[in-house]
Structure formats: structure tokens, C-alpha cells
């Protein structure tokens, strides 16, 4: 418990320095002390760490285990419908159930996948054989997780940007999800570079993530912190890096204010890449260099795992970039939390036909194994199909 409480910081009355136009690194400790000196000690007392503190640390470490990553299968029913439509299937509960059954029941999936993010329908759903999806995952030593945000809505007063809703009622929902078997949670918000990002949008994203993280930990769920920096735009990799630095500085400022235990969280950042419409592309080595520099400058080593999103990269590109980041030791477990970059070829292979289930599962396992090797820094790229090289960027993508 001592190590868990080491990162439990007292809430500070100082507002975000970056929002005020100043560098987070220039904050003067003396000013904080001066403000605190006028406040009664009892007013500064924060609530004790979550009763689940030890379990949170254990869950986070289990997910962030060598050679393992997360399979994101938490698409909303509407987004799942788009995936099904791409192979000529209607968006019905039966079809969604059939596809999700294919994913969770792939034999040996737990060799490479340590966690699976589910949509709420899936958390309470059974497979086509009548077994609970959660139980099937647990049998494969895969930790069930749950998407808890309620999606993006326009952020009034911003540069046509968005904010993520879902804090209302979150405490009761996360408690219920824990009882249903979930042990970690995900909240996705986005930052758009072509539209700014405005200080308002970054602050709103960071504050929402911090409140969600604190509430999730209080319910026993390890929060995945995901401020996705969208690939949309023609900007270069340096612009992405600058924005990412500001976003993560803001996120950790508010995580600390909300007394979030860093040893009991996981991060799901975007890799630092040029905009999808930029003329200059980056090599895996360049992506790794910029991304690792960002992590070293902004992410405390107390965080156990960094599970990258693919963000519309091709299956092959996402794996190559991850492999490049694991060519030298890192203070965190650097891995993956992929959806399309794990499932795209699998979905096409299945095509909604029962006779194709095994072939589709074999494709899924091959893709999961490739990323497992990349997490270990041992991926070679041999034997990849042309489909794995196809980009999946969608402008203005919604999840």
C-alpha cells in the first residue's frame, strides 16, 4: 500500500498553468506552498486510497504483462453496424453476437491478449453457445474491460471541437460493471489538431479523463486514460508532438488533482505521427523516436502500461511502429490496444459465414501474435498479406 499511496497527490488550488498560457514546467512550488499556508490542514486532507488499491495495481500489471496487449472490441452498436455492413450483413443483435463470439472464443487468444474492451451490450451478452462472453474471456486468462463514456458532442465556445459526455451516473454504472465481471474501463476523448486545439478543449478533455479515472478506481476498475489526438490534417510530425506534449501535461496535472493512483491506471495514447493527409510520411524509427521522447518527457514511470491505439493506421504499420518502440528497454510496458488493426482482415475473412469462422480466427491469432512479438521487439514483418498493408484512416472518425 505504501507504494500505491506514494503517487496520491493532494488536490492543488492552482489552476492549470498551460490553460493560463504558461508552461507547466515553470510552475513555482513556492506559490503553491504560499497558498496552502493560509488553509487549515484539515481542509487539505484527501480521502484515503481506494479500497481496491491493491487489486487495481494487480489488474494493471496483469494486463501490462510481457508479450500481451489489449483487443478493443468496444465499438458502439452503430459503429459495429458499419463494420458488418462492409461485409454485407445487417446490423442485428444476432449478427453482432456472432461476430463477437468469433473474437472471444478464438482458441489460444490469451497467449497474446491480456485484456478485452467490451461495449455494454457485450458485457451482458452470451455467445452463440449460451456462455457468458465475460466467462469465455476469463477462461482464456483475458481480463474483461468496459467502455464507459457516452460519446462525443460539440463543445460550445470552441473551434468546432468536441467533448466527451458520460460522467453523470458513472459511479453507479462502474459499480454495476464491476459486479458483472469487468475489471478495467475505457474513456475515449479526442483532440483535433486542424481545429486548434483550443485551451478550452484540452482542459475539458483532461478534466473529464481525470474525473472518470478517479470514479473508476473508486469502483475497482483500472481506468484506461485515452485522449486520442486525431490523425486528421496535413500537419507534420513536429506539430503532433507539440500538441501531444501539451495534452499529456494537462492530463497528468488533473489526474494528480483528482488523487488518481498512477500505479493503477493504463494509458492509451496516439502514436506521434504526421497528419494522415501530410505529404511527408514517417518511418517506424521516426515514429518511435518522437513517441518515446514524448513519453519520457510527460509520463511518470509509476504508470505500469502504455497501450497504444492504432488510430486508422494499417495493420502492418501499427505493428511495425510498435516494434520500433520496443527495440530498447522502457520504464513502462509499451504495448497495443488495437481494434481495426487486429480485426480488419479477420472480419473480411469471416464475411458472415459459419464455414469461415476458423479461418477468420486463425487470421486474428496471427495478427495478435505479430503484435505480441512487436511488444517484445521481435517482429520481423515476414509473411504479411497485402490486406494488412491497407490504411484504415477515416476522416472525422467516430467510435
UniProtKB/Swiss-Prot annotation:
Posttranslational modification: Can be trimethylated at Lys-395 by LSMT-L, but the trimethylation has no effect in vitro on the kinetic properties of the enzyme. S-glutathionylated.
Tissues expressing this chain: Highly expressed in rosettes leaves and cauline leaves.
Predominant location? plastid
Q: What class of enzyme is it?
A: lyase
Please indicate which residues carry the site annotation Necessary for preference for fructose 1,6-bisphosphate over fructose 1-phosphate. 399
Q: Which cysteines are joined by disulfide bonds?
A: none
Output the GO biological process annotations, alphabetical, semicolon-separated.
gluconeogenesis; glycolytic process
Keywords per UniProt? Chloroplast, Glutathionylation, Glycolysis, Lyase, Methylation, Phosphoprotein, Plastid, Schiff base, Transit peptide
Where is it localised?
Plastid, Chloroplast, Plastoglobule; Plastid, Chloroplast stroma
Look up the transit peptide and give its residue range: 1-48
Reaction(s) catalyzed by this protein? beta-D-fructose 1,6-bisphosphate = D-glyceraldehyde 3-phosphate + dihydroxyacetone phosphate
Could you tell me which SUPFAM superfamilies the record lists for this protein? Aldolase
Chain positions recorded as substrate binding sites: 96, 186, 310-312
Q: Any idea which residues bear N6,N6,N6-trimethyllysine here?
A: 395
Say what the protein does.
Plays a key role in glycolysis and gluconeogenesis.
Subunit arrangement? Homotetramer.
Task: Tell me the protein family, please.
Answer: Belongs to the class I fructose-bisphosphate aldolase family.
Q: What is this protein called?
A: Fructose-bisphosphate aldolase 1, chloroplastic
Query: What species does this protein belong to?
Result: Arabidopsis thaliana
Amino acid at each position: 500500500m505504501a507504494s500505491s499511496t506514494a503517487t496520491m497527490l493532494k488536490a492543488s488550488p492552482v489552476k492549470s498553468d498551460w490553460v493560463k498560457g504558461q508552461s507547466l514546467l515553470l510552475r513555482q512550488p513556492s506559490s503553491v506552498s504560499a497558498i496552502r499556508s493560509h488553509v487549515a490542514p484539515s481542509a487539505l486532507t484527501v480521502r484515503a486510497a481506494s479500497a481496491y488499491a491493491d487489486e487495481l495495481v494487480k489488474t494493471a500489471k496483469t494486463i501490462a504483462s510481457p508479450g500481451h496487449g489489449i483487443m478493443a472490441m468496444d465499438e458502439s452498436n452503430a459503429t459495429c453496424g458499419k463494420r458488418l455492413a462492409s461485409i454485407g450483413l445487417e446490423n442485428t443483435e444476432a449478427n453482432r453476437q456472432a461476430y463477437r463470439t468469433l473474437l472471444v472464443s478464438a482458441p489460444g487468444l490469451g497467449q497474446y491478449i491480456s485484456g478485452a474492451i467490451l461495449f455494454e451490450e457485450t458485457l451482458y451478452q452470451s455467445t452463440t453457445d449460451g456462455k457468458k462472453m465475460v466467462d469465455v474471456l476469463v477462461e482464456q486468462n483475458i481480463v474483461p474491460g468496459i467502455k464507459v463514456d457516452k460519446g462525443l458532442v460539440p463543445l460550445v465556445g470552441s473551434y468546432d471541437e468536441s467533448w466527451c459526455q458520460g460522467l453523470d451516473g458513472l459511479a453507479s454504472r462502474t459499480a454495476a460493471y464491476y459486479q458483472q465481471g469487468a475489471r478495467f474501463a475505457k474513456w475515449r476523448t479526442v483532440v483535433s489538431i486542424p481545429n486548434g486545439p483550443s485551451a478550452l478543449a484540452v482542459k475539458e478533455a483532461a478534466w473529464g479523463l481525470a474525473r472518470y479515472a478517479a470514479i473508476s478506481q473508486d469502483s475497482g476498475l483500472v481506468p484506461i486514460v485515452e485522449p486520442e489526438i486525431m490523425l486528421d490534417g496535413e500537419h507534420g510530425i513536429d506539430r503532433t508532438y507539440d500538441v501531444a506534449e501539451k495534452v499529456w501535461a494537462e492530463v497528468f496535472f488533473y489526474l494528480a488533482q483528482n488523487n488518481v493512483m498512477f500505479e493503477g491506471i493504463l494509458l492509451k495514447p496516439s502514436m506521434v505521427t504526421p497528419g494522415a493527409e501530410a505529404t511527408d510520411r514517417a518511418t517506424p524509427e521516426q515514429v518511435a523516436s518522437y513517441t518515446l521522447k514524448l513519453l519520457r518527457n510527460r509520463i511518470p514511470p509509476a504508470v505500469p502500461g502504455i497501450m497504444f491505439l492504432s488510430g486508422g493506421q494499417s495493420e502492418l504499420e501499427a505493428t511495425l511502429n510498435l516494434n520500433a518502440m520496443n527495440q530498447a528497454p522502457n520504464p513502462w510496458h509499451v504495448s497495443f490496444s488495437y481494434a481495426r488493426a487486429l480485426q480488419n482482415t479477420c472480419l473480411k475473412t469471416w464475411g458472415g459465414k459459419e464455414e469461415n469462422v476458423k479461418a477468420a480466427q486463425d487470421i486474428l491469432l496471427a495478427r495478435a501474435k505479430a503484435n505480441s512479438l512487436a511488444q517484445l521487439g521481435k517482429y520481423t514483418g515476414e509473411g504479411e498479406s497485402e490486406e494488412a498493408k491497407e490504411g484504415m484512416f477515416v476522416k472525422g472518425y467516430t467510435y
